[in-house]
Amino acid sequence: MKHSKKLLLCISFLLITVFISGCGSMTKEDNKEEKIKKGFEKTLGMYPIKNLEDLYDKEGYRDEEFDEGDKGTWILYSEMVIQRKGDDLVTRGMILKVNRNTRTSKGNYIINKISTDSKGVSRNTQKKFPVKMENNKIIPIKKIEDSKIKREIDEFKFFAQYANFNSLKDYKNGDIATNPKVPSYSAEYDLENSDYNVKQLRKRYDIPTQQAPKLLLKGTGDLKGSSIGSKDIEFTFIEKPKKNIYFSDSLDYKPSEGH
């Protein structure tokens, strides 16, 4: 009888130990997830930026990489990648550098096409169309003959202009990955088509699938802030061999070039 009681006590102790260890691991993962979300909130909390010219008066995270007197440059980048099954992979996106020193904004509308021939050899074709921003409107710097591309530039909006991440704190049970040696970090979430930002993307792009996407928050550098690191977000609808649909976006604050 005494042996049975001792055995029960040992088993109970082991179960409690395992439970506490499990809770400890969950707490660590929860802390990592919260830190990643807080790191992204500093930028995503600015969305939507309906008037991009507001960035001229908005300062980001500064570190020793900035020269004295440099007000910094905001760099926006948004792109949609669509590859229907068996077709070429086509990327359409824009980069815009908002220089707070000169209060000017220039960039490029970029169309990238990756095709693969019958021998499996890939070929990359890229077209760049210089653009600038005036009165919160993106306009071509050079004359564009192609009416389709001209219309795409005229109608283009950066994700930062219409996205809203007020519900970021409600995203739970993300797939968390960290590498302190790089350092790098990421959090991935399964979204529903009812998600506000997913609906906004479907409204603006012809997305040839009803499959709901995954949201990936990924970055490098110090989570608290770093002009060397980066923070990117991706909405992946489909990721398969010869069939890909995903959207990428970033908003970074960097030292100005040539300052």
Curated annotation (Swiss-Prot):
Gene Ontology cellular component annotations, sorted alphabetically: plasma membrane
Cellular location(s): Cell membrane
Membrane topology, as annotated: Lipid-anchor
Lipidation positions, renumbered (S-diacylglycerol cysteine): C23
InterPro entries given in the database record: Csa, Csa_sf
Main location: membrane
Source organism superkingdom: Bacteria
Signal peptide: 1-22
Lipid modification (N-palmitoyl cysteine), residues: C23
Keywords of the record: Cell membrane, Lipoprotein, Membrane, Palmitate, Signal
Pfam annotation, one family: DUF576
Family statement: Belongs to the staphylococcal tandem lipoprotein family.
Name this protein carries in UniProt: Uncharacterized lipoprotein SERP2453
Organism: Staphylococcus epidermidis (strain ATCC 35984 / DSM 28319 / BCRC 17069 / CCUG 31568 / BM 3577 / RP62A)
Phylogenetic lineage: Bacteria, Bacillati, Bacillota, Bacilli, Bacillales
